[in-house]
Amino acid sequence: MTRQGLEFQRQRAIRSAQNQWFPPPTDVVKINFDGATCPKKRKAGIGVVISDVNGLVLASCAKIKHQPFKVVEIESLAAATALSLATDIGFRRVILEGDSMEVIQALRENSQALTPTSLLIEDVRSFAHNFDELLYARTKKDGNVVTHSLVKYVLSIPNILV
């Protein structure tokens, strides 16, 4: 896929902020990420799903963080986890997609600040050099159902020590 093709996909994602999941172009993987908080249990969860053009799940991960986070913070950590997983597997052309407008907008901008959230965003951006192509796309909750379900599941698991 050419750079113009990826740009077309990015523009389509920006315009529609889709209500459903759309596959990435050929030779590109889509990495959906999500984060959720559970303040009553003082924990948060992260979910990542990497899919190909056919919608086949190539990799996924879920993590529990045993401390409370603001939503934007856990979403930022989920984005960093997503790119870390993609780097470890060796994907080079990716679309990072999440339902947090604040995180996706911050990733697209090139501003630098010293707030806790902006430092987390910089952590996500630090992975960019690992990819030949990296696009940021926003979806609505309905376009991120699988990843959101993964996060909700991991948050529902009781803490068990073995």
Where in this protein do the model-derived segments appear?
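Primary recognition of RNase H-like, Mg2+-dependent phosphodiesterase/nuclease domains
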Residues: 1-162
